């Protein structure tokens, strides 16, 4: 569980939806310091490893950037092996005295797999291809699960609708969305 420290920057929602070899990762742009919005257009969904991996973060912003750098390093050591790179990152996260204090979570995806990396160093693969993290994560997750079986709606449309619902409910999530996708 991420505990809020009013001196750190927090607040976001990240959602990932996978259908076959297509995946979408979407996040809002709000950064909050305590209970104040300090930025509305932050980019918390990014491409890594030569654009073959998409990563989104929730939690303390500075901590998340540290994790992005570490993950990029692990991906360089284990190219094309997202699971292995994430497990190696999680091991470091659990064992390193400095990293253990980081307050962030990540969703990472490539053409084959989607994973959630938690603040306790767990690496989890969602059973149904849908994962969400952050302050509005449960709202986005619920909406995406409700829409996933609707005929004729793309995963990108589902992601946008789910994030709109999350942003309408969660005060730490806004409507400025960044979306990245990998399509077959």
UniProtKB/Swiss-Prot annotation:
Entry GO MF terms: metal ion binding; threonine-type endopeptidase activity
S-S pairs: none
Compartments, as annotated in UniProt: Cytoplasm
EC code(s) of this entry: 3.4.25.2
Residues annotated as binding Na(+): 167, 170, 173
Superkingdom as given in the UniProt entry: Bacteria
Top EC category: hydrolase
GO biological process, any: proteolysis involved in protein catabolic process
PROSITE patterns xref list: PROTEASOME_BETA_2
Catalytic activity: ATP-dependent cleavage of peptide bonds with broad specificity
Main localization, broad class: cytoplasm
Regulation: Allosterically activated by HslU binding.
An example Gene Ontology CC term for this record: proteasome core complex
Keywords: Allosteric enzyme, Cytoplasm, Hydrolase, Metal-binding, Protease, Sodium, Stress response, Threonine protease
Active site: 12
Residues annotated as signal peptide: none
Family listed: Belongs to the peptidase T1B family. HslV subfamily.
Role, per record: Protease subunit of a proteasome-like degradation complex believed to be a general protein degrading machinery.
Subunit structure: A double ring-shaped homohexamer of HslV is capped on each side by a ring-shaped HslU homohexamer. The assembly of the HslU/HslV complex is dependent on binding of ATP.
PANTHER family: ATP-DEPENDENT PROTEASE SUBUNIT HSLV, METALLOPROTEASE TLDD
Protein name: ATP-dependent protease subunit HslV
Species the sequence originates in: Wolbachia pipientis subsp. Culex pipiens (strain wPip)
Upper classification of the organism: Bacteria, Pseudomonadati, Pseudomonadota, Alphaproteobacteria, Rickettsiales
């Amino acid at each position: 569980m991420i505990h809020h420290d009013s001196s750190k920057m927090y607040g976001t929602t990240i959602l990932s939806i996978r259908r076959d070899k297509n995946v979408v990762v979407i996040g809002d742009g709000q950064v909050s310091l305590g209970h104040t919005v300090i930025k509305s257009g932050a980019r918390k969904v990014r491409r890594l490893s030569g654009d073959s991996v998409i990563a989104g973060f929730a939690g303390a912003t500075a901590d998340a950037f540290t994790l992005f750098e570490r993950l990029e390093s692990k991906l360089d050591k284990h190219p094309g092996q997202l699971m292995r790179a994430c497990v190696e990152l999680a091991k470091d996260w659990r064992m390193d005295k400095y990293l253990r204090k980081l307050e962030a979570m990540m969703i990472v995806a490539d053409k084959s797999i989607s994973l959630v990396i938690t603040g306790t160093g767990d690496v989890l693969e969602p059973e149904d291809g849908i994962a969400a993290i952050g302050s509005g994560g449960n709202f986005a997750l619920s909406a995406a699960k409700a829409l996933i079986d609707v005929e004729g709606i793309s995963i990108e449309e589902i992601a946008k609708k789910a994030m709109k619902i999350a942003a309408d409910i969660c005060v730490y999530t806004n409507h400025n969305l960044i979306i990245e996708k990998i399509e077959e």
